[in-house]
Swiss-Prot record:
Family classification: Belongs to the PITHD1 family.
Domain PITH, first and last residues per copy: 20-192
Classification via InterPro entries: Galactose-bd-like_sf (IPR008979), PITH1-like (IPR045099), PITH_dom (IPR010400), PITH_dom_sf (IPR037047)
Intrachain S-S bonds: none
GO CC annotation: cytoplasm; nucleus
Record-linked Gene3D superfamilies: PITH domain
Coiled-coil portions: none
Organism: Drosophila melanogaster
A Pfam family it matches: PITH
Name of protein: PITH domain-containing protein CG6153
Classification of source organism: Eukaryota, Metazoa, Ecdysozoa, Arthropoda, Hexapoda
Length: 211
């Protein structure tokens, strides 16, 4: 079920907590840094390379200067390889506040280089989407299903009625595991450490080594 992160605060006494919340969300939604961006594919993008621009920092999710727009019809298909394995726990999909916003996403794990024909298969999970121009609605994948993912495909088959689909931001929340010669490092982006400590270096203190 999707849920929102927006809150209605009544006074300036909440400003500090708002800042901390934004910093914390920025830390949690840092899996974009673990995407093998050079090998990301976006099928049916209007301009080559446009699709990569929607994977950006949480605090820049409302930057409307970078987006992807579909070309021949309303379909978009992202093939997203990671530099290690992820456990996917949350997705935010933000589009325009009009009918070009996608109305559905179908999610496939560990199926590299999917085509539109491949995307007709049954997905591992799908969500009916709500218009979200501010990037405040999170969709929660089944953690058991998406507990060991090295490649993610996101298929957007349709929108709310426009000829083309436009997406500004795709955010991914979860855990990242990378193999090293001397063990495995697990980076937990749900750590509730003091967000202010991460203002300059978002990953300090987030990982722990397992020998």
């Amino acid at each position: 079920m999707p849920h929102g992160h927006s809150h209605d605060h009544g006074g300036c006494s909440h400003e500090a907590s708002d800042v901390d919340h934004a910093l914390e969300m920025g830390i949690e939604y840092s899996l974009y840094t673990k995407i093998d961006l050079d090998n990301v594919e976006c099928l049916n993008e209007e301009t080559d390379g446009q699709g990569k621009s929607v994977f950006k920092p949480y605090e820049k999710r409302q930057d409307l200067s970078k987006y992807v727009e579909s070309d021949a019809d309303e379909e978009l298909l992202f093939n997203i390889p990671f530099t290690g394995n992820i456990k996917l726990k949350g997705i935010i999909i933000s589009g325009a506040n009009d009918d070009s916003h996608p109305n559905m996403v179908k999610i496939f794990k560990n199926r590299p280089r999917m085509t539109f024909d491949d995307a007709r298969a049954k997905p591992d999970q799908e969500f009916q989407l709500t218009r979200d121009a501010r990037g405040e609605i999170e969709y929660s994948p089944k953690v058991v299903t998406f507990s060991s993912v090295h490649h993610l495909s996101l298929y957007f088959p349709s929108n709310f009625g426009e000829d083309i689909t436009r997406i500004y931001y795709i955010g991914l929340r979860g855990e990242f595991t990378e193999a090293h010669y001397h063990g495995v490092t697990i980076c937990n982006y749900e750590s509730r450490a003091n967000a202010a400590d991460h203002k300059e270096k978002a990953f300090d203190g987030v990982g722990r080594a397992i020998q």
